[in-house]
Amino acid sequence: MCGICGIFDRSGNQVDQGILQKMTTILQHRGPDGEGHYIDGEVGLGHRRLSIIDVEGGAQPIGNEDGTLQIVFNGEIYNFVELRKELEANGHRFTTRTDTEVIVHAYEQWGKECVRRFNGMFAFALWDANRRELFLARDHLGIKPLYYVDLGNRILFASEIKAVLQDPECPRDVDVEALAELFTFRYVPSPKTLFKGIRKLPQGHRMTLSRRDIAVERYWDWVPCLRGNFDEEDLIEEYRTLLEDAVRLQLRSDVPLGLFLSSGVDSGALLAIMNRYSSGPVRAFTIGFEGGEKTNEVEDASAIARMFGATHRFMTVTPEDYLKYYENYLWDIEEPLGNETAAAFYFVSKIAREEVKVALTGQGADEPWAGYDRYLGVKLSTFYSRMPSVVTDQMAPLFARIPGRFERMKRGVASLSEPDVLTRFTKIYSFFNAEMKRQLFKGELMEQIADDEYRSKEALRRLQTDVQHLDPVTQMLYIDTRASLPDDLLMVADKTSMSNSLESRVPFLDYRLIEFVESLPPGLKLKGVTGKYLHKRALEKWLPKDVVYRKKKGFANPVEDWFRNRMRPFVEECLLSSDSAVGRFFDQRYIRRMLETDRAGKDQFRRHIYLLVSFELWHRAFMKN
């Protein structure tokens, strides 16, 4: 895993080497092991290397035999060994042992269709000097990031936003439409970012740049095609075989690797499979939080580690540790999020990097397999919408009594009476609902985003279009895997691990596993009220049932309680000071009422406060400096 960047001048002018150098330098944390550049007239490529495969011989950029192809690459092609054999059989000759060089020869052999053959996580830029074209691609699930900005006469791209901002002509303005979407979804859906004009190349997409044209196209998708007749036991064996092969491939490394271990079933299963293929004890790493006893995973994770003879290292994060990191973490992740797990990934990456360069994680099994409560809510809402009004009218007063701290449940209940699936989804996903936004957003901002609710629904409609003929649960699983997974959770994992110069890998997001899951009927994912049904049945092969069916904790933390108590002065300074960015965009009187409600012990605004503080810190990091 590395950091890549580059410039393509559409007017044909020579690339500014000084800007390219600045772009490369600011990505040093992604690749502390080396730096490389390539310039050919209108194109410039930059690379920072974190050496994983062929440590001695894998410096980038890498070219073909005559130098007419040059590539900078971030990520891993896990099936590079098999592809190399196929390419050698077709007459290609290699000078390194890297997966990077496999991409170059795959492009020679299959052209732009080569991306369909890669099993991995990747973002790369390949310069074809004969065609005078720059070819960029991002992996199937969007595990590795790739940003770009069109400045008219030139296009810049990079693994991180801060690199493209090194060009003084790159604007630093807030995209107010993206801001509205952030407060709806808790993240900004692709292709937008919170920076006006800076875009993400979406998952499973490729882009070709030439002086004549900019072409972006999708090369892969997994529109569900549900199986008809099936045998459940056969499906379980098929899934086990695919998962085991995914882990086997992702253990390919020339440097030490380990595992982020929680108390849950997903990382526990990875440990069991890793233990089978590893020559020595697996190194496992876990994070706990002071005051987070209800969600602390260290004890249960230690028991799983002992079960498989793994070495286990853990850290207990204090409020002081968190505050020291939190003031700078928006510089790492580059966009504010309502995702409070970022700190957990940062700290577990920090302790892991002291021993390994690569860590496998259990991310990616919840969104495809219905691992969250909201999927059950969608299923129940389908039944509720079919009930006669005489029944639902009797239930409404009971729903009104749900305490404010159960904010997600209240949102789900509010959607129950909606007959339209898309409207139901919009209510479920709306973090700040329409009424909250009217009170929070200042008048001039509300005028700019007057059609916010319509656009939020349209953002979901774009994702839903290909699956609207399917049941609501399958639709939501598809939307989450296409949107919240790459634009929120995977982005956090990449940025926080790479800020520690650590590569994180996600075996559950092997694209073959996703295609398998998407072929299953919803009843094998969410059976009755049990999420991840067939997934858990398959994992019984490797783990005791009490671990497989243990209540999910995840990398949780008590940060929202810290905000109310020990971090309260910091929170109030961020949100209520007269020179804050929050005060420019939002009504501080409403924010003060939110804080007063929170201090009174009512929980309905805790996560909203977290997002507001994140926005303030992001603005300080990128707009003020």
PLM regions: where:
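Active-site adenylate/phosphate-handling loop in enzymes that bind or generate adenylated species
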Residues: 140, 347-406, 484, 489-513
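Phosphate/oxyanion-binding loops and surfaces in catalytic or ligand/nucleic-acid-binding neighborhoods
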Residues: 30, 80, 143, 164-167, ...
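A generic secondary-structure signal for well-formed alpha-helical elements
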Residues: 27, 87, 91, 168, ...
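Alpha-helix capping and helix-loop boundary segments enriched in small/acidic/polar residues
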Residues: 292, 317, 336-339, 386, ...
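Adenosyl-5′-phosphate
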Residues: 1-4, 113, 166, 197-203, ...
